[in-house]
A protein has these predicted regions:
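S-adenosylmethionine
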Residues: 1-418
Length: 418
């Protein structure tokens, strides 16, 4: 019978295996706080932990044994778990996972060797060192070096290991930010734009999401970078707005909370994500948001009832590489490849071309990504404006994280249709 801490380690192990085998998202697994800390920590440092293991064995063991070893080494060197406890619980974990006595002996030997040797020496070549030290694939580090230069690229790689700052967005239609902060025990926390409250690191998000205040629709989780993106739309009362790639619905909800007179269509191509957006709208009590399942690239878009007329404002937050939010979504860095970025570029451009056809003359379209990469941002915009002279850039692009490190790494550019 496993005790509670061992159950949490087993949870983390199983979720990590699913991530490795099926590409599942760790944050969607519903793990307990300690198990989530372990799983996300191992995911963030996966390449480094693999490098560590390779320095101690002649041949890598099976995926299952490697995951157990990564959990053990992570606890020994990156948490406050005492070394002896990390070794003992990791050996117990491999036995509980029925991976065999031979695997248990191997894990025990490797962890004791790690304890004696300490962390391995990193390679001298800078790109390789930055890649391993920060668990960012070498091709991506080299790409960042080429685009941003060595110092900024190294800083970007280091930032992927940091926990993203968490914020709540208060629904000002129901309550004020200071009142919600007091209800949640966040008195004294930083408040931005009168509606965003920074969540201290020691506060568990699970506790906030289980509160009556959340159930009543008094707040949502959202980074303030979203507000800076929405501001570019220059919203006015009674406008028709289309949030074309809206899931999970946070920006649509923000707009509705900002002005209840707006007529907002929030759409997504995924039926499952659309169902979740309905839940968001219902929880927040928003009456001016319609939620629809719409494929922006569909040839029948112009005949679709929901999109039968033009919109005064369009927000196009396109699918992207997530390079600006790797600290929040650590799995993203391992999903990327040079080919996947090229595919994303073509999808992003196609979405922009299709959505722009539904913008009225004099209207504003905001193109946004949670990636600062030029291939997904400025190159898309410049290509589009060149091909469509009826559109022009409306002001400079916005990179919220450049001004405040607490913000997600978004890019947004407003386009005006002449």
């Amino acid at each position: 019978m496993l005790d509670e801490s061992m159950k949490e380690r087993m949870e983390a192990y199983r979720v990590l295996l699913l991530w490795q085998k099926e590409g599942s998202f760790i944050k969607e697994s519903g793990l307990s706080p300690f198990a989530m800390e372990l799983a996300l920590g191992v995911c963030r440092r996966h390449l480094y932990l693999q490098y560590f293991i390779k320095s101690l064995v002649k041949k890598l063991p099976s995926l299952e044994v490697c995951m157990v070893l990564e959990l053990g080494i992570f606890q020994m060197f990156f948490t406050e778990v005492p070394d002896h406890a990390a070794v003992a619980t990791t050996v117990e974990l491999i036995k509980a996972a029925n991976l065999g006595e031979g695997s248990a002996r191997l894990v025990n030997a490797v962890l004791h060797a790690a304890r004696r040797s300490g962390q391995p020496q990193l390679p001298p070549q800078r790109v390789r060192r930055v890649s391993i030290e920060n668990s960012v694939p070498e091709w991506l580090v080299r790409r960042w070096f080429d685009i941003y230069g060595g110092d900024r690229a190294e800083a970007m790689a280091k930032a992927t290991l940091e926990r993203g700052v968490e914020w709540i967005r208060v629904n000002l239609q129901k309550v004020s930010a200071p009142v919600v902060a007091q209800k949640l025990g966040l008195t004294g926390a930083s408040i931005l734009y009168d509606r965003y409250v920074q969540v201290p690191e020691e506060v568990k998000l699970k506790t906030l999401l289980e509160s009556d205040s959340f159930a009543k629709g008094e707040f949502s989780l959202q980074n303030p970078a979203a507000y800076l993106v929405v501001k570019l739309l220059d919203l006015k009362p009674d406008l028709k707005v289309w949030d074309a790639c809206a899931a999970p619905g946070g920006k649509s909800a923000l707009m509705a909370e900002m002005d209840s007179s707006l007529d907002i269509l929030a759409s997504d191509v995924s039926e499952n994500r659309v169902l979740k957006m309905h839940d968001v709208v219902d929880r927040l009590g928003l009456t001016n948001v319609r939620v629809e399942c719409i494929d922006v690239l569909s040839k029948g878009l112009t005949q679709d009832d929901a999109c039968s007329s033009e919109f005064d404002r369009i927000l196009l937050d396109v699918p992207c590489s997530n390079m600006g939010v790797i600290s929040r979504r650590p799995e993203a860095v391992y999903r990327l490849s040079p080919d996947s970025i090229k595919e994303l570029m073509e999808l992003q451009y196609s979405l922009l071309e299709s959505a722009s056809k539904k913008l009225t003359e004099g209207g504003i379209l905001v193109y946004a990504t949670c990636s600062p990469d030029p291939d997904e941002t400025t190159k898309i915009i410049n290509r589009f404006v060149k091909a469509h002279p009826e559109f022009k850039k409306r002001g400079p692009a916005v990179y919220p994280a450049n001004d405040d490190a607490r913000f997600d790494g978004f890019f947004a550019q407003a386009l005006l249709k002449n």
